[in-house]
Amino acid sequence: MLKDLYKSHIVPSLKTKLGYSNVMQVPKIVKVCLNIGLGIRGSDSKVMNSCVRDLALIAGQKPVATYAKKSIAGFKIRKGFPIGCKVTLRNNKMYEFLERLIHVVLPREQDFKGLSVNQFDGCGNLSIGIKEHISFLEIDYDKIDKILGLDINIVTNAVNNNDAKLLLMEFGFPFIN
């Protein structure tokens, strides 16, 4: 499991690579946030229920519906409309999800060559977009109504992008360069 790998191999390796004197200075993954945005389709209760069901299957815990903060006429949404759902994973469920993401989902993604350094936000957090949520094995292709996209944000306590990239490479994330 990735949690055991982190404690036994990744922490000592990063401690020497980054030149830290204390184990607590080594960066770690704090949480993983999953989000499915539906936009105008969120007002359809059937689509919204399938979104919540699918995200619950992917994450292993119940997601929370997200609502529009303000009305935007160009997007045809009003304040309070449901526009998607999200879930935050921590601890054991986070590590289980990351293991499935690295070893199953990313290799199954179409035209996937690897993650880019440009996907970091400058503070050590990585954002990944999955075009088709059916890449997850938990989703039964026959039971879905629409193929949805999925946003994955991996939040670390790394000081900069380079430390976060080293951390994620130790976990086995495939980077292009």
UniProtKB/Swiss-Prot annotation:
The keyword rRNA-binding applies. One of its GO terms (biological process) is translation. One of its GO terms (cellular component) is ribosome. InterPro entries: Ribosomal_uL5, Ribosomal_uL5_bac-type, Ribosomal_uL5_C, Ribosomal_uL5_CS, Ribosomal_uL5_dom_sf, Ribosomal_uL5_N. Keywords: Ribonucleoprotein, Ribosomal protein, RNA-binding, rRNA-binding, tRNA-binding. Part of the 50S ribosomal subunit; part of the 5S rRNA/L5/L18/L25 subcomplex. Contacts the 5S rRNA and the P site tRNA. Forms a bridge to the 30S subunit in the 70S ribosome. This is Large ribosomal subunit protein uL5. The lineage of its organism: Bacteria, Pseudomonadati, Pseudomonadota, Alphaproteobacteria, Rickettsiales.
